């Protein structure tokens, strides 16, 4: 079963019929929705917050930005599973990224976990978020970098911008990947498809979307039982113009988002961001070389192409 048929029973179909808070509860394992936030394992313990000036997004950041000293923040714009408006639905994963010195901006509001309001039960149409929310996140972050009085004034590196997302949110990331400010893309548990799905009315993400990629791309997929597996592997085969890596961990479509600190997939995402945005040698070593970290880890299957020879 690939994502084109599985969306009827997967998280994407939920987005068109229930509230963001109800969808978040459906997507998260029992107990996960009520678990406390985790600060991440990076050097900068992280937090999440809603900012009035950013009405359609939630910010994940180091709790003490000043502790970074002269080091600059990178920016990651994030699309949620189901294109939902619950920006806390993958909070452990996003807090982990933020703890490594990234300003992660997720579409939506806090609708699950700590800080969430009671579920309203309101039925919202699909999609609850749009690709433009990712662009708005990048716009806001880069504007804050130059705004006198902003807590982020001069603290963001505008060359360190990534876009990423889970499932339907990954499709949103693909749709905006042509933005020249974006330096890398992470596609998680997702892949493009031809046509239009009744469960995702109006969302068209054909294979031609892959031509928008102008930077290195990482796919993190849940193995053959992931409903996005077939579409993602088709994408990997078709991408011939930019470096692309395909990292498969056999955990299914739900990934490791709800494991402590986002689990194994979050660590791979951090290593990729550190390599692609900061030139980090340790991050590079997870992907490149005959004895690369993912190459020798029996839990992962790594494929890659179009990279310069090591």
What spans do the regions from the language model cover?
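Short amphipathic alpha-helix adjacent to the substrate-entry channel of hydrolases
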Residues: 88-107
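Alpha/beta-hydrolase active-site loop
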Residues: 123-158
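Gly/Ala-rich beta-loop-alpha elbow adjacent to hydrolase catalytic centers
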Residues: 165-169, 173
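N-terminal cap/lid segment of alpha/beta-hydrolase-fold proteins
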Residues: 27-71
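A fold-wide structural signal in alpha/beta-hydrolase
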Residues: 75, 101-108, 184, 245
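Short beta-strand element of the alpha/beta-hydrolase
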Residues: 70-81
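The feature captures the conserved acid-bearing segment of alpha/beta-hydrolase catalytic domains
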Residues: 183-259
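Alpha/beta-hydrolase-fold serine-hydrolase catalytic core, especially in secreted/extracellular enzymes
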Residues: 251-254, 259-310
């Amino acid at each position: 079963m690939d994502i084109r048929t599985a969306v009827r029973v997967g998280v994407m179909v939920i987005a068109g019929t229930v509230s963001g808070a109800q969808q978040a509860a459906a997507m998260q394992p029992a107990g996960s929705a009520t678990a406390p936030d985790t600060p991440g394992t990076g050097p900068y313990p992280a937090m999440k917050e809603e900012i009035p000036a950013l009405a359609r997004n939630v910010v994940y950041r180091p709790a003490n930005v000043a502790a970074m000293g002269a080091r600059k923040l990178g920016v990651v714009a994030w699309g949620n599973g189901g294109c939902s408006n619950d920006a806390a639905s993958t909070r452990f994963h996003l807090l982990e990224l933020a703890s490594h010195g990234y300003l992660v901006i997720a579409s939506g509001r806090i609708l699950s976990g700590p800080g969430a309001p009671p579920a309203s039960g309101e039925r919202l149409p699909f999609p609850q978020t749009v690709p433009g929310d990712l662009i708005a996140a990048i716009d806001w972050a880069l504007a804050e970098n130059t705004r006198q009085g902003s807590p982020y004034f001069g603290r963001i590196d505008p060359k360190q911008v990534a876009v990423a997302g889970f499932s339907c949110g990954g499709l949103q990331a693909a749709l905006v990947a042509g933005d020249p400010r974006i330096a890398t893309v992470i596609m998680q548990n997702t892949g493009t498809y031809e046509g239009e799905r009744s469960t995702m009315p109006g969302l068209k993400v054909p294979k031609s979307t892959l031509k928008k990629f102008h930077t290195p791309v990482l796919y993190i997929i849940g193995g053959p039982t992931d409903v996005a597996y077939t579409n993602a592997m088709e994408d990997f085969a078709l991408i011939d113009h930019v470096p692309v890596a395909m990292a498969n961990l056999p955990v299914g479509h739900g990934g490791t988002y709800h494991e402590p600190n986002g689990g194994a997939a979050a660590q791979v995402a951090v290593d990729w961001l550190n390599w692609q945005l900061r030139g980090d040698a340790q991050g590079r070593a997870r992907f490149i070389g005959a004895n690369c970290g993912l190459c020798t880890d029996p839990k992962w299957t790594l494929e890659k192409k179009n990279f310069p020879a090591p």
